């Protein structure tokens, strides 16, 4: 099943639509990682919200790239400062050894990267790896957005959305390849 995700926009957020079949959605070039065979369990947005409310001992791990985390991230989240998702396997090797026995809830924008990221962490010996079902955007949709700081970068013309899923004051400069808050 492929979940249908909807958000509304007053402008056309995509310049074009292109449908094609790809071997991997998020390319890592690692054939030993197959989310159909191994992936972390899901935590719903409401469950993550409750973990924050109850001050549970959980490590919240951001699997997104550094330019995305500059726009916003969860309260007390571990930001791996990734240049690209391909850096993720090396980045988790730098995490403290005690994290391997802690509960980790990872997240990304829509949940796709976490399918692979959770498999990578489980293969690397992390014992309790979970992923935020539907990603940050589903968290915004199903909670009041509390515990999120800033906005969420999206991969379309809107650039970033707030916790109410409204377009925010960011533009993307295609000359310097930077996000600019206006």
Tell me what each language-model feature is.
Residues 1, 92-139:
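Catalytic cysteine-centered active loop of the rhodanese-like fold, especially the PTP/DSP P-loop
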Residues 2-59, 64-71, 155-176:
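Flexible, polar/low-complexity N-terminal or interdomain linker segments that lie immediately upstream
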Residues 24, 64-69, 83-87, 111-113:
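Short acidic/polar capping segments at secondary-structure boundaries
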Residues 30-31, 70-75, 89-92, 116-120:
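A short secondary-structure junction signal
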Residues 51, 75-104:
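Helix-loop module immediately N-terminal to the HCX5R catalytic loop
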Residues 56-60, 76, 103, 128:
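Short active-site oxyanion
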Residues 122, 133-175:
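Redox cofactor-anchoring modules in respiratory/redox and cofactor-processing assemblies
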Residues 180-182:
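Conserved small/polar residues in nucleotide/adenosyl-binding loops
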């Amino acid at each position: 099943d492929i979940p249908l995700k909807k958000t509304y926009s007053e402008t056309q957020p995509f310049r074009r639509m292109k449908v094609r079949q790809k071997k991997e959605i998020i390319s890592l070039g690692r054939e030993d990682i197959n989310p159909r065979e191994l992936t972390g369990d899901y935590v719903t947005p409401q469950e993550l919200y409750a973990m924050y409310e109850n001050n549970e001992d959980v490590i919240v791990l951001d699997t997104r790239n550094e330019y995305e985390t500059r726009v916003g991230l969860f309260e007390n989240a571990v930001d791996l400062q990734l240049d690209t998702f391909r850096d993720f396997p090396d980045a988790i090797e730098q995490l403290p050894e005690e994290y391997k026995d802690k509960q980790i809830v990872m997240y990304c924008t829509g949940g796709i990267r976490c399918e692979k990221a959770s498999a990578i962490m489980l293969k690397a010996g992390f014992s309790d790896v979970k992923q935020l079902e539907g990603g940050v955007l589903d968290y915004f949709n199903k909670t009041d957005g509390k515990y999120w700081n800033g906005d969420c970068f999206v991969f379309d013309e809107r650039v970033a959305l707030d916790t109410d899923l409204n377009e925010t004051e960011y533009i993307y400069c295609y000359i310097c390849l930077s996000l600019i808050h206006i």
